[in-house]
């Protein structure tokens, strides 16, 4: 009897690099998986995890998608007759249908293609790119406030452990305290 394999796309063991800054600076609308055209020394560097996606971006040129600004540091063991360029532009491989969709979407004002995650899939390097719209400063502040509010709610719920039986003396009043806090919080926003 054959063992069943579970699908794992982008699990922590397969992830090479993440662009954490992208989720802070952009509203992510659509995601796409793209292959990369790489040289041999680049694959070896990726296996060593020597890549930075933070400053990366994608552009459409001549009906193709190109990756710019991704720094791939060469290993010290690279051959002497090869002169590696760490900031080389790399071609992304997408289906024609996805390319047509992206060409129309990127031409709209305010939209950009940004790299999110670089990972291994069946022995090949894949890049998750996103069609995203840039956030304004006030949008970033609003998301920070929302994150802080959810943290505070979690703290309050953790402090007052609510169970059906054996409630502590404070837990009975804890729900009222939480409601008052929520009402106060909504008035202040």
From Swiss-Prot:
It is found in: Cytoplasm. It holds the Pfam family SmpB. CDD domains: SmpB (cd09294). Keywords: Cytoplasm, RNA-binding. The keyword RNA-binding applies. InterPro entries: SmpB (IPR023620), SsrA-bd_prot (IPR000037), SsrA-bd_prot_CS (IPR020081). One of its GO terms (biological process) is trans-translation. GO terms for cellular component: cytosol. Its main location: cytoplasm. GO terms for molecular function: RNA binding. The keyword Cytoplasm applies. Belongs to the SmpB family. Required for rescue of stalled ribosomes mediated by trans-translation. Binds to transfer-messenger RNA (tmRNA), required for stable association of tmRNA with ribosomes. tmRNA and SmpB together mimic tRNA shape, replacing the anticodon stem-loop with SmpB. tmRNA is encoded by the ssrA gene; the 2 termini fold to resemble tRNA(Ala) and it encodes a 'tag peptide', a short internal open reading frame. During trans-translation Ala-aminoacylated tmRNA acts like a tRNA, entering the A-site of stalled ribosomes, displacing the stalled mRNA. PANTHER family: SSRA-BINDING PROTEIN, TMRNA-BINDING COMPONENT OF TRANS-TRANSLATION TAGGING COMPLEX. This is SsrA-binding protein. It comes from Nitrosococcus oceani (strain ATCC 19707 / BCRC 17464 / JCM 30415 / NCIMB 11848 / C-107). The gene is smpB.
């Amino acid at each position: 009897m054959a063992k069943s394999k579970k699908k794992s796309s982008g699990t922590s063991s397969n992830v090479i690099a993440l662009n954490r800054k992208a989720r802070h600076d952009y509203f992510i609308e659509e995601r796409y998986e793209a292959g990369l055209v790489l040289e041999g020394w680049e694959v070896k560097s990726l296996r060593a995890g020597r890549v930075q996606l933070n400053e990366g971006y994608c552009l459409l040129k001549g009906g193709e998608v190109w990756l710019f600004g991704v720094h791939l540091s060469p290993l010290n063991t690279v051959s002497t007759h090869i002169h590696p360029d760490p900031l080389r532009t790399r071609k992304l491989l997408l289906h024609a249908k996805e390319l047509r969709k992206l060409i129309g979407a990127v031409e709209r004002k305010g939209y950009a293609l940004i790299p999110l995650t670089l990972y291994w899939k069946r022995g090949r390097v894949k890049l998750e790119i996103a069609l995203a719209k840039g956030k304004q400063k006030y949008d970033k502040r609003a998301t920070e406030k929302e994150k802080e509010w959810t943290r505070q709610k979690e703290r309050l719920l953790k402090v007052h452990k609510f169970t059906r039986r054996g409630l502590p003396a404070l837990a009975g009043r804890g729900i009222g305290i939480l409601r008052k806090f929520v009402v106060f919080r909504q008035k202040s926003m």
